[in-house]
Amino acid sequence: MSDNTKTNSRNKSVKRTKKVKKKKKFGFFKKLFTILFCLFILLSVAASGVIFAIVKTSPNLDINGTILNLDQPSQLYDDNNNPMDTVVTNQRRYVVSIKDMPKNLSNAFVSIEDERFYKHSGIDTKRILGAFYNDIKSKIHKQNSIQGASTITQQLIKNRMFLNDSLENRISFKRKIQEAYLSIKLEQSLSKSQILEAYMNTIFLGVQANGVEAASRQYFNKSAKDLNLIECAFIAGLAQSPSAYYPFSQNVAKNPNIYLDRTKLVLYKMRQNNYIDFSTYQNAINDLNNNKLAFSQQKISNKYTYEWFSIPVVNQVKQDLKSQYHYTDEEIDSLLRDGGLKIYTTMNTSMESNVQNILDNNSTLKSYSYADKNGIIQPEAAATLFDYHTGEIKAIVGGRGQQPPSSYNRADSSNYLRSVGSSIKPLTVYAPAIDTKLATEDTIVNDSPLSSDVAEKYGSNGVPYNPHNDDGGYSGPVNLKTALTKSINLVAIKLEDKLGLSTGAAYAQKFGLTLNNDDKSSIAALSLGEIRGSNTTTMAAAYGVFGNNGLYSEPRLYRKVVDKTGKVLLENNYSTRKVISPQSAYIMYDLLKGPVSAGGTGSYARFGDMPVAGKTGTASDSKNLWFCGLTPYYSAAVWVGNDQPTKLSLGSNDVAEIWGEIMKMANVNLTVKDIDAPGGVTKIGDSYYIDGTSPSNLSGDDSSSSTASKPQTPTTNTQNNTNNNVANPNSNNTTNSNTSNSTETPAQNTQQPTPTPTPSTNNTPGNTNTNTNTNNNTNTNTNTNNNNTNNSSSGNNNPPNNNTTNTNK
C-alpha cells in the first residue's frame, strides 16, 4: 500500500472519530439541556404552586372597611354637638378629599414615588423585578439594602393591610407577592384618584403626622390646600424616610441640605414628568436657594383643650365599653385612638370656659395667690356645675391657671379627695333626721357640751370626745333651722348620735358619697365632715337631690357614643334613684336657704333675685373650704385649698362668693322662679312640716314623753342615747305640761334652759318644758387633739380621732 493510500486511510479514520465525538458531545448537551429544561419546568411549576398558595392565603381585600375607611382619633362633641376635643394619641390624621389638595402635591408624590402610576395596573413590572432581584442579593449577602420600588398602590396596600408585618420583617417575599396580587385587585375596584387620595391620607410623614393634612399642619402650621410648590415638594420628599429629612432634628437643622437636596430632587422629577415647566422649576429652585422654605413648627401637645372634662369622659367611655362589650384594654385604646368614634358629651362649652375664668380671676383668690415650687398657682380651686334635672354635668374645672397635661383633676378625681367639713351635715344629719321623722325644722336641740356618757361613747383611748363650735361658745336651745344657718357643730353631733351612725352612713351612701369603714364608725366624720374625702362632682350631684324631689340623678358625662359607621355603641340615658321623700327634699331646700340668708355662713352666695340654697364647709383646721348648693335650675360645688394642705387665710364665705359668681353665670337669662312645694307638706308660720308631723308631737328632750311614732330609718341599727340632749319622741322619763317636749334640758346642769314658747296659731313648737334634770351635762374635758384632721390628698387615710376639738362651719 502506498504512503498516500495510508495517509488517506488515516485521515478518514480521524474524521470518523471526530464525527463520533461530535455526536457524543452533542448528545451530552442535548441531555443536559433536556434535564435543565425539565428542571426549569419543574421549578416553574413549583414556583407557580408556591405563588398560587401564597396568593390563595392572602387576606381579604376589604375596600370599604380597610382601604377607604381611614383611622382617625375619636372626636368629642359638646352639648350642642359642636366639636370640642380630639382624643389625645401619638398620631395625627385629618382626612381630606383629593379635591382639597393642591395639584402640585399629588403630582409631587407621583413623580418621586411612582412616576408610571397612571400607566400600570397596580404593579410596575420593571421596578418590581428590579426590587425582587435586589432583595435576593440582600438576603444572600446578609445585607439590609432595600430597594424601594413599590408602586403607590402597593404602598397603600402595605400601609393598610401589612403595616405591622412590614415593620417587623422588612424583607418578606410572601408579603410582596400578596401585596402585588392585592394591588392588582384594588386597581380593578378603585379609580386612580381614589387610590391616590387614600394613599395621601395614610402615608406616614414624620413624628405624629399621618397623611398630608397632618404633615402640613405639623411642618407649616397650615392646611394642605394652602401649600405652595416647594412646600408640596418637601412633604412628598419625606415619604422615603421621614426621620432622615425631619427639619427640626438637631442633625438636620445643622445641615439643611439634607432635606433641601431631597426637595430639589422632587422638583426635578416633576419637571422631568412634565408636571411643571422649566420656568416654574427654576423659580422653585431659586426659592429654595433663597431660604424661602419657611417652617412653622406646630407645638406637639398631648393635652386636651378641655382637659378637666375630656379626660373623665374618655375614662368613663373606656369603662362602659369594657363593661358592655368585654373589650380588652388594648382593644379599647385602639378603638379610641383609631376608631373615629364620636363621643357626644354633656359639657356646655360656654359654662366650662366661664367657670375656669371665674376660678382663675376671682379677686379674693388672686389676692392670696402664689406659685408653689412646681410653678402651680396656690391656693387651688375646683368646681362642678350639675343639671340635676337631667343628670348632665355641664362643667368640670379641676384647677386654676396653667396646668401641665394630666394634672390632678381636683374636681373629679378619686385620687384627690378632701374632707368636706360642715357641707356634709345636710346629707348625713339634717336630711336623715327630717326623712325619718326624727325631727322637724323647729325641733329644739340644746347647743351645749356633750353629756359625759355621750362624750365617753365616742372617746378614744380613754379620752372623752370633746367637740367645740367654731366660735368656742354655745347658744343653748335652738331649733334646726337656726342650727343649720349658723352651722352649729354640737347640734349636728347630737342629732347624729340620735340617728345612729349606721343610719347617717346609709344616707351618705345614698347621696353618692364614698365612705370607708373608719368614716362609717366616726361621729366626727358623719356629723362634721371629717371623712376621708370627696370632690366637687360628688357633692354637686348630692345637693341636686334637694331640688329634684328627693331623687338622685346619676351624673352623666356623655349622652352617647357612635362609631364611624353611625352605629350607636353606648347610650347613656338619664337615670335616678330615690334618696329621700319629695317632702323631705323640699324641707331641706327650705332649711338650706338659712345659711345663705343675712347672718348665715354663706350669705355671699346670693345673687340677684334667683332663689339659692346651700351650705358652707370648713374642714381640717381651715385647710379645705367648701360651698355646695343649688338653684331651681342647677346644683354646684366649689372647693378651695392648697395642694399641700396648709391653713388658708380665706373663709368659707369667700368660697360662697365664688359659688355665687358661677351660679350667676349659669342662671343668666333664666326665668326667676322657686321650687314648688310637693303635696304632703304643710307650712306653719315660716316653717314647713311633713303632713302628720307638727311641733307638738315631734319636739321634746331626752327625758320627755311623746306620742310621736318611732323614727323610720333606712337601716335597722339606730342608736338612742338618753343623754344626747336632742328631742327624743320615744323617751318617757320627764314631767311636762304637754305630751311632747320641744325644749331640751342639759343633763346635770344647774342652768335652766330657756323654754320653748307656746305656739300661737301653730307657728312655733308648742311645748314648754319644766324638766329640771340635774344630770351634769357640762363636760370639762378640754382635749384639743387634732388627730381627727384628715388630709387625704397627702396620703393620710388614718381614721378620724373622735376626741378632736372640731371647729367646722
Swiss-Prot record:
Residues 1-34 are cytoplasmic. GO terms for molecular function: penicillin binding; peptidoglycan glycosyltransferase activity; serine-type D-Ala-D-Ala carboxypeptidase activity. Residues 56-809 are extracellular. It catalyses: [GlcNAc-(1->4)-Mur2Ac(oyl-L-Ala-gamma-D-Glu-L-Lys-D-Ala-D-Ala)](n)-di-trans,octa-cis-undecaprenyl diphosphate + beta-D-GlcNAc-(1->4)-Mur2Ac(oyl-L-Ala-gamma-D-Glu-L-Lys-D-Ala-D-Ala)-di-trans,octa-cis-undecaprenyl diphosphate = [GlcNAc-(1->4)-Mur2Ac(oyl-L-Ala-gamma-D-Glu-L-Lys-D-Ala-D-Ala)](n+1)-di-trans,octa-cis-undecaprenyl diphosphate + di-trans,octa-cis-undecaprenyl diphosphate + H(+); Preferential cleavage: (Ac)2-L-Lys-D-Ala-|-D-Ala. Also transpeptidation of peptidyl-alanyl moieties that are N-acyl substituents of D-alanine. It is found in: Cell membrane. Residues 381-664 are annotated as: Transpeptidase. The keyword Manganese does not apply. It comes from the Bacteria. Pathway: Cell wall biogenesis; peptidoglycan biosynthesis. The chain crosses the membrane at residues 35-55. Residues 694-809 are annotated as: Disordered. GO terms for biological process: cell wall organization; peptidoglycan biosynthetic process; proteolysis; regulation of cell shape; response to antibiotic. Keywords: Antibiotic resistance, Carboxypeptidase, Cell membrane, Cell shape, Cell wall biogenesis/degradation, Glycosyltransferase, Hydrolase, Membrane, Multifunctional enzyme, Peptidoglycan synthesis, Protease, Signal-anchor, Transferase, Transmembrane, Transmembrane helix. The active site is at residues 113, 422. One of its GO terms (cellular component) is plasma membrane. It is a single-pass type II membrane protein. It holds the Pfam family Transpeptidase. Residues 74-251 are annotated as: Transglycosylase. Its EC number is 2.4.99.28, 3.4.16.4. Cell wall formation. Synthesis of cross-linked peptidoglycan from the lipid intermediates. The enzyme has a penicillin-insensitive transglycosylase N-terminal domain (formation of linear glycan strands) and a penicillin-sensitive transpeptidase C-terminal domain (cross-linking of the peptide subunits). In the N-terminal section; belongs to the glycosyltransferase 51 family. This is Penicillin-binding protein 1A. It comes from Clostridium acetobutylicum (strain ATCC 824 / DSM 792 / JCM 1419 / IAM 19013 / LMG 5710 / NBRC 13948 / NRRL B-527 / VKM B-1787 / 2291 / W). The lineage of its organism: Bacteria, Bacillati, Bacillota, Clostridia, Eubacteriales. The gene is pbpA.
